[in-house]
């Protein structure tokens, strides 16, 4: 994935295995990367792919008892 690539909610769901409603809940709780608006003033959003991948990597590192990117 390109560092600057944006992915929509379906892609985020596919990468994480988490439901749409839970993704938004985690965002509200500051526990998941926030989406970016695709158009100023619009309602369509997407996530920065590298931020989602970093979040996934951190979950794996937590499971393995270490920090991400060690």
Identify what each model region corresponds to.
Residues 1-28, 54-59:
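Polyanion-binding surface elements
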Residues 51-70:
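A short, Lys/Arg-enriched interface patch at domain edges and termini
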Residues 11, 47-48:
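A composition-driven signal for long, intrinsically disordered, charge-rich low-complexity tracts
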Residues 9, 40, 63-64:
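Intrinsically disordered, low-complexity segments enriched in small/polar residues
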Residues 6, 46-47:
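Short aromatic/basic micro-patch
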Residues 16-46:
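Major-groove DNA-recognition helix of helix-turn-helix-type DNA-binding domains
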